[in-house]
Amino acid sequence: MAKKLLQKLSDISRIHHRAAFTDVLKHTAPKPSAFLELARNRYSCRAFEDREVPANMVESILEAARLAPTAMDKQPVHVWVADTGDTMEKLGKATQYLYGAPLVFVVGCKPDEAWVRKYDGKNGAEVDAAIVGTHIMMEAADLGLGSVWVGSFDPAVIAAEFPELEGWEVVALFPVGYPAGAPAQRHSERKSMEEFASEL
């Protein structure tokens, strides 16, 4: 069954090489799910309108983040919301990639509280934080907001400017706000299904 489906997707992908993912879905499902539509429409937003995000939207994003799955449900993750001039100025010392967003979600983890794979000692803290971050981005998109994953920041500056984060490893920053820019051209450039998936 899986082999036939992958072959069908591969054939379609060859016909529509580098085409939008929706073209493939037209041949495999009667109607894309709401989540696939959301995933397709979300993009990394690097320009924001100069207006605040309502408190109820911030709460909704935090709730989506709180509900994110983590390994063994250990939840070694914390989210901080930066939305004041002073806090944003401090974050701006650590990265140039805030893009004028009205608020930033800071996601951190504690490796010593995370699940560890016994076979090789792989720590799941950063993976857990990444899942939380993905929930932040997807909920923001569902609310009509833009977001972008920012991994380019100076951890030493973060530590110096925010001593209250001691003991936490900051994984990513998520500027969020009302989008004012279009997706980058490369956003729609996806691997073909043949390149992306295969039978094991």
Say what each PLM segment does.
Residues 1-200:
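Acidic, surface-exposed loops and disordered segments
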